[in-house]
């Protein structure tokens, strides 16, 4: 691996891209009002002083602001990519040059380099891990068990990662507590529902220049991401079709006014397909074979296993690359979850935890403050009524 010319150990495309990255980071920061508030508190209180953090996240301008916030809270932070395709090389360069944050990420890096970068991040001997898909935690528990002793806790950002970590906890192999940031109500609201919904539509349109109005838009999965995507696709004029394996979510989709059917049925009808399930083989060779000529297939889940890419490769007569892009959202829950883990790790078990309700509500309150919105508070009389049982109708 190559390293940058700075003394800070990193592996990036090159520091010559840092000027553009610096502008991107500053631009993203303007719209991250909640993180700005948290960063000011972190600078003042230094809650992460002495902590080493290894973060395996999308290396984007938004994530850069999270890393800067953690550093300003006293942490020693290194960052590696959770997805080789999402890395913004200019942002990585600016983090190294301008913010003294170690980065191991190069856009489009091959599989070997990707995992070598995770190993390099673990050489940092972290006290806290931050993950987006649980690859770093998995490597730590399998190939780098020597680095486990100093770890006091971690956070996980995605549904896919939380599923993997809960499986590890169930088997008794998870060696430290993890806060599932993905399960926070504010994360569902800002990131999964509204963030993923908008950014997925934006990505499809930017890549294809396809007119959604009047098209049949098939969405596999009606979780938080699927709901947000369905809402945005309908808003763009598409006829939305939902496929699901969970009867409750399928019923919810139907009651929300969407057509619900199996993927086998939907494959024959759709103009655009998007998988948001967190599972594998959602769109298979059999589905692809019956799709319309020119159908658009996309995935907004974390890994690329939801679509049978190997089968698609074999069926394709040629390939052509179009434009690349990515958007990321809200990191307030991540930063506060790290602070929570540092303060409470000694009392936590080796399992996956939800974000504490008081922390989640704090993020919501900070967001409302940043928007200039005020809400009512319960009166003492109302609090007493809610807590009691003797007063009836």
Task: Pin down the residues of each PLM region.
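Glycine-rich phosphate/diphosphate-binding loop of Rossmann-like nucleotide-binding domains
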Residues: 57-75, 187, 191, 195-280
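Glycine/serine-rich phosphate-binding loop and adjoining beta1-alpha1 elements at the start
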Residues: 2-48, 79-215
